[in-house]
């Protein structure tokens, strides 16, 4: 593997000194870029794009050709794991992901097999190794997975949901059944993420997109417990370096202290959290990633500049901050505004690292 030329992102996650705040964007390879749309059209559909290692590599690299980013993130989808379990993932126009065979009974959960990451998910591993090779050491590669709770919401509901009625009903009426599913998913995610590291991922992120839908006690029981299990089971060193782990619960501002106790290296923050307050609460234990509202990118470059300065100022001096959006970039954002955001972070952050 090529020697890493820019390790700013990895150093910030490990709270080591950096010259400026590193920056990347969730969904930085995505529909806001015309070149992404062209490659997706070439692939035919979303999952065909994910399953073609060369095209997945191409879209991963596209934002790095445009912007001065400090990390690349594997182009894939959190639902690759349940798809590999045989649920029959497909996408309905305007409705998002759906499963042909939801896992909403104890019998269906018992039948689930833990997928072999080098077999059923081999296309992801081939993409990881291809991307790592093609990056040529320019920036680190982030691997990722959905959290067990978030994956389970799609599996039990049969797709996207606004109310999570089916899975919450299961949580309160048949908690042992849900725990069986979450335990299988945690085991699957551990294997999946460790295989990503073995194939070249240099940092890992767990997306708990729907943890914020849970009550205080339910979050600990059904989400955090299984992210803890994953953190405990992950490969944390590869290529002579530590492999940092970031946990991100959207809507998880109430639970930062509990998340920081898991032994992860960093926490992702959504835009509802004040990053300065978060640093006071948990900054002695973990680095922080975030957390500009993605909608700010609809504003003028001048306003984007102001918002970046406000977040940098709130975090304050020193390392331990990876700048990002508070969630994925919106598909209708002007790509030039994304560039203004990234340039603003690099231009403004140097004074906080002297």
From Swiss-Prot:
Q: In which pathway does it act?
A: Porphyrin-containing compound metabolism; protoporphyrin-IX biosynthesis; coproporphyrinogen-III from 5-aminolevulinate: step 4/4
Q: Where is this site: Transition state stabilizer?
A: 77
Q: Which UniProt keywords apply?
A: Cytoplasm, Decarboxylase, Lyase, Porphyrin biosynthesis
Chemical reaction(s) catalysed: uroporphyrinogen III + 4 H(+) = coproporphyrinogen III + 4 CO2
Q: Does the keyword Lyase apply?
A: yes
- Provide the top EC class: lyase
Q: What does this protein do?
A: Catalyzes the decarboxylation of four acetate groups of uroporphyrinogen-III to yield coproporphyrinogen-III.
How does the annotation summarize its subunit structure? Homodimer.
Protein name per the record? Uroporphyrinogen decarboxylase
**Native species of this protein?**
Shewanella piezotolerans (strain WP3 / JCM 13877)
**Organism ancestry:** Bacteria, Pseudomonadati, Pseudomonadota, Gammaproteobacteria, Alteromonadales
Q: Which gene encodes it?
A: hemE
């Amino acid at each position: 593997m090529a020697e890493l030329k820019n390790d700013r992102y990895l150093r910030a996650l490990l709270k080591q000194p950096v010259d400026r705040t590193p920056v990347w964007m969730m969904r930085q390879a995505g529909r806001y870029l015309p070149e992404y749309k062209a490659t997706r059209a070439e692939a035919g559909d979303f999952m065909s794009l994910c399953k073609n290692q060369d095209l997945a590599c191409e879209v991963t690299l596209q934002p790095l050709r445009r912007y001065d980013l400090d990390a690349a993130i594997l182009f894939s989808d959190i639902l690759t794991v349940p798809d590999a379990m045989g649920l029959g993932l497909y996408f309905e126009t305007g409705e998002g992901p759906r499963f042909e065979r939801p896992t909403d009974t104890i019998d269906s959960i018992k039948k689930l097999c833990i997928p072999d990451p080098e077999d059923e998910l081999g296309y992801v591993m081939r993409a990881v190794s291809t991307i790592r090779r093609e990056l040529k050491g320019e920036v680190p590669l982030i691997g990722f997975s959905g959290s067990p709770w978030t994956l389970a919401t799609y599996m039990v509901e049969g797709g996207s949901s606004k109310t999570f009625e089916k899975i919450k009903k299961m949580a309160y009426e048949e908690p042992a059944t849900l725990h069986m599913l979450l335990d299988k998913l945690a085991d699957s995610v551990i294997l999946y993420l460790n295989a990503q590291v073995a194939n070249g991922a240099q940092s890992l992120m767990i997306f708990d997109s729907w943890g914020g839908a849970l009550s205080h006690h339910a979050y600990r029981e059904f989400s955090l417990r299984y992210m803890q299990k994953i953190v405990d089971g992950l490969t944390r060193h590869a290529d002579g370096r530590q492999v940092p782990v970031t946990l991100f619960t959207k809507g998880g501002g109430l639970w930062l202290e509990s998340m920081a106790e898991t032994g992860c290296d960093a926490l992702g923050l959504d835009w509802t959290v004040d990053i300065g307050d978060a640093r006071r609460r948990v900054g002695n234990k973990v680095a922080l990633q975030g957390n500009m509202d993605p909608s700010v990118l609809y504003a003028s470059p001048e306003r984007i500049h102001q918002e970046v300065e406000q977040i940098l100022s709130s975090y304050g001096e020193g390392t331990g901050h990876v700048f990002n959006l508070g969630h994925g970039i919106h598909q209708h954002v002007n790509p030039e505004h994304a560039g203004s955001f990234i340039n603003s972070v690099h231009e403004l952050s140097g004074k906080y690292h002297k």
